């Protein structure tokens, strides 16, 4: 069974979520206070957000591109809270202390098995799920059933929020609107990246 999933975000009045912009809005600490009150036992971010805030600058480059080729998972150690990264192709490298934060990385099954070996060697949990592209629905089932996650927070960026929305996985949205306006063209929105032009609105 999948966790109860809440997308928790802070945006400008016009719905933009550029980190440098939202950091300039007063009282951003209120966002993190609300995050604590939501009592998540795992928080998930997309590759770009994790690259900006947590991963090492240089990407992981596999010498052997043989894919893992099947659905698998690895629990480095059971935890009460996980920091989750979506990294479809296995490109993020992590600092040595990443395991201290109970990091969990989700890839698809085309990701090189060498990357999963790298994660295992560094005491990092992982899930490989989806023949071509991550199967979000199935990976959430694994997260709930095998890792014991009951309440999951999706905290950006806009494309991963949009992917969870499109997959019908969101149970709730928590949106804090800061007292600022972005207005710049091309900046990510709270929910972004859905290319299906006839995509119906979600209620």
Features from the language model and the residues they span:
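Enzymes that bind and transform nitrogen-containing heteroaromatic metabolites
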Residues: 1-203
């Amino acid at each position: 069974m999948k966790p109860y999933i809440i997308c928790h975000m802070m945006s400008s009045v016009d719905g933009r979520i550029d980190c440098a912009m939202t950091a300039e809005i007063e009282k951003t600490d209120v966002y993190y206070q609300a995050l604590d009150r939501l009592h998540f036992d795992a928080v998930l971010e997309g590759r770009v957000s994790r690259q900006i805030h947590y991963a090492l600058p240089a990407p992981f480059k596999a010498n052997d591109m043989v894919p893992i080729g099947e659905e698998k998972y690895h629990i480095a150690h059971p935890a009460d809270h996980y920091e989750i990264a979506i990294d479809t192709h296995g490109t993020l490298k992590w600092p040595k202390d990443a395991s201290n934060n109970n990091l969990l990385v989700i890839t698809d099954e085309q990701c090189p098995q060498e990357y999963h070996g790298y994660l295992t060697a560094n005491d990092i949990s992982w899930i490989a799920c989806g023949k071509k592209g991550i199967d979000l629905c199935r990976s959430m089932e694994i997260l709930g059933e095998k890792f014991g996650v009951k309440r999951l927070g999706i905290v950006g960026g806009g494309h991963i929020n949009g992917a969870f929305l499109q997959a019908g996985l969101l149970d709730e949205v928590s949106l804090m609107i800061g007292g600022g306006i972005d207005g710049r063209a091309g900046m990510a929105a709270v929910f972004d990246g859905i290319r299906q032009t006839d995509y119906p609105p979600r209620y």
